[in-house]
């Protein structure tokens, strides 16, 4: 049995200092019934907690660390920038370098604005969509999480799903009434919403792969249908690629599925592990953003040189060949997890998109939030705790996916499959 004495003591102290002892709810490990692990360091595919336990990491800071922890090139870039100054409140050339890479690789982006978080990116994109169209309502999907902006914290997933909250107290009814929610992968409901409110719907915002109800890919024709419906009704299509951006493919989720939105939100990978976000799209739309247009958005640390340098060094290391290797590794892990579950007769459903994998303990195909909620949460919690004992660090929520990095080796994946085999053998009915 692993010892967690130092993590337990640190969490006891933290609960007097921060709400729930953490700075983001899912980190409290509540849904898996254990004390949170306090991490000390990471290198490559491994993390080490303050009690000295080693884990193969599939959290990767919730997705950003696509090259694993403390990537040499990213670390050297950060050192070089920090020695010259960490922030100036003025433009720097590294902003141009990262912007060029983003524009080159993301089909929908002709102009991009850097911000500080994924939430900031989605909030800014909504304001832009409303300002550009002159409309008020937005359409989002039940269980899709787009950050904690008021307009988007309606029937959201992620930590909200983990905590069992349908919304959040503090979101005014006047804000909520302008957010239309329908089931993910349900194109007919989208069409019906446009029949009812089409003249006032500014945009549809969607994760190309729903990553905050587990991992739920789009059904064939769903994204294409959204593109068609929005174009027919004069609304903008926004892809929230904070999670899928540069994660599922070289050209992001929109390249992977061949559907080009009007606006795209980015985060996570483009900051290489530092706080970052971005939104971009067609030039005619983005030029409405201040100072070139009237739609205001600003940020003290937007385009921070540390985040820009980490993001640039992260992206330049990603090539089309990187994603071929991601696919191979992810297929290997997916097959191994499926084989272990089948061997022990454990109800399961595994979804995957590129290097994102979601395992649900249910017999039901998971194509939307209602299906995701059919998972056996008690079994997941027990499985999670056993995987920790086996030295595997997974996201502490049924409603989050696993992430792979370029640092994960075949040996890591084989060890993870072996750990899952042990865990499932102990937990089978």
From Swiss-Prot:
GO cellular component: cytoplasm
UniProt cross-references to SUPFAM superfamilies, sorted A to Z: PLP-dependent transferases
UniProt KW keywords: Cytoplasm, Isomerase, Porphyrin biosynthesis, Pyridoxal phosphate
Modified residues (N6-(pyridoxal phosphate)lysine): 268
Enzyme class: isomerase
EC number, as in UniProt: 5.4.3.8
MF annotations from Gene Ontology: glutamate-1-semialdehyde 2,1-aminomutase activity; pyridoxal phosphate binding; transaminase activity
Reaction equation(s) it catalyzes: (S)-4-amino-5-oxopentanoate = 5-aminolevulinate
Localization of this protein: Cytoplasm
GO BP terms, alphabetized: protoporphyrinogen IX biosynthetic process
UniProt xrefs under Gene3D superfamilies: Aspartate Aminotransferase, domain 1, Type I PLP-dependent aspartate aminotransferase-like (Major domain)
Major subcellular location class: cytoplasm
Residues annotated as signal peptide: none
Domain of life: Bacteria
Pfam families: Aminotran_3 (PF00202)
Pathway it works in: Porphyrin-containing compound metabolism; protoporphyrin-IX biosynthesis; 5-aminolevulinate from L-glutamyl-tRNA(Glu): step 2/2
Cofactor: pyridoxal 5'-phosphate
Family assignment from sequence similarity: Belongs to the class-III pyridoxal-phosphate-dependent aminotransferase family. HemL subfamily.
Stored NCBIfam families: hemL (TIGR00713), PRK00062.1 (NF000818)
Quaternary organization: Homodimer.
Record HAMAP family: HemL_aminotrans_3 (MF_00375)
The name this protein goes by in its record: Glutamate-1-semialdehyde 2,1-aminomutase 2
């Amino acid at each position: 049995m692993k010892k967690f004495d130092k993590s337990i003591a640190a969490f006891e102290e933290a609960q007097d200092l921060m709400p729930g002892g953490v700075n983001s709810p899912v980190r409290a490990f509540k849904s898996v019934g254990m004390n949170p692990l306090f991490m000390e360091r990471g290198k490559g595919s491994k993390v080490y907690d303050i009690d000295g336990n080693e884990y193969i990491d599939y959290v990767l800071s919730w997705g950003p660390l696509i090259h694993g922890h403390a990537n040499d090139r990213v670390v050297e870039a950060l050192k070089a920038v920090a020695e010259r100054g960490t922030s100036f409140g003025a433009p720097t050339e590294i902003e141009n370098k990262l912007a060029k890479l983003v524009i080159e690789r993301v089909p929908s982006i002709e102009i991009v604005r850097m911000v500080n978080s994924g939430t900031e990116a989605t909030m800014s994109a909504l304001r832009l969509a409303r300002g550009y169209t002159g409309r008020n309502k937005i359409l989002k999907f039940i269980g899709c999480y787009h950050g904690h902006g008021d307009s988007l914290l309606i029937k959201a997933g992620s930590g909200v799903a983990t905590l069992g909250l349908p919304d959040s107290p503090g979101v005014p009814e006047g804000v909520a009434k302008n957010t239309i929610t329908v089931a993910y992968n349900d194109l007919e409901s989208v069409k019906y919403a446009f029949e009812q409110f089409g003249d006032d719907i500014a945009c549809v915002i969607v994760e190309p792969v729903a990553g905050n109800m587990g991992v739920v890919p789009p059904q064939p024709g769903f994204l294409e249908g959204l593109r068609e419906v929005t174009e027919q009704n004069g609304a903008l299509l926004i892809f929230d690629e904070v999670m899928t951006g540069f994660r599922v493919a070289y050209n992001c989720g929109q390249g992977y599925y061949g559907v080009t939105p009007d606006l795209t939100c980015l985060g996570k990978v483009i900051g290489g592990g530092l706080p970052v976000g971005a939104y971009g799209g067609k030039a005619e739309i983005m030029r409405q953003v201040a100072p070139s247009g009237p739609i205001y958005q600003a940020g003290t640390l937007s385009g921070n040189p540390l985040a820009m340098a980490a993001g640039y060094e992260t992206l330049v290391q990603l090539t089309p060949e990187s994603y071929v290797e991601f696919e191979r590794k992810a297929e290997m892990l997916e097959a191994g997890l499926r084989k272990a579950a089948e061997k022990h007769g454990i109800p399961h459903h595994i979804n995957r998109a590129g290097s994102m994998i979601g395992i649900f303990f249910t017999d039901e195909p998971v194509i939307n939030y209602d299906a995701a909620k059919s998972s056996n949460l008690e079994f997941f919690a027990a499985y999670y705790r056993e995987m920790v004992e086996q030295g595997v660090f997974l996201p502490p929520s049924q409603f989050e996916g696993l992430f792979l990095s370029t640092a994960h080796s075949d040996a890591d994946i084989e060890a993870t499959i072996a750990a899952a085999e042990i865990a499932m053998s102990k937990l089978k009915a």
